[in-house]
Amino acid sequence: MITFEYRFDIVPGKTAEYEKYLKGQGKNIWTKYKGVKAVRKYKSMLGGSSPQRVVQVDLDSLASLERILSDPGFKKAKEKFHSLVTHVTDSLLISV
């Protein structure tokens, strides 16, 4: 199993649009794909720290992640996501 983790901030002034995205195009963006085992979403408790949001996606394999990232529907949703967020970083994690 692997964990794909990404961290980001919402672009100032785009919070309402981001919340709308989560209820529409971004809703269940990960869980609808085969190979996804769990999704965890976090918001920082420390005001002013960056990044403010963290998402962790557990997948059964790297192949599943690659398949999801190459899906046209996912790519379209990801493009919209990136128009609403900044300071995006990601990691691929395995347990030790």
Each language-model region and where it sits:
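Compositionally biased amphipathic helical and low-complexity segments enriched in hydrophobic
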Residues: 23, 63, 93-94
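Short amphipathic alpha-helical segments
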Residues: 14-41, 73-81
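Absolute protein N-terminus
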Residues: 1-2, 96
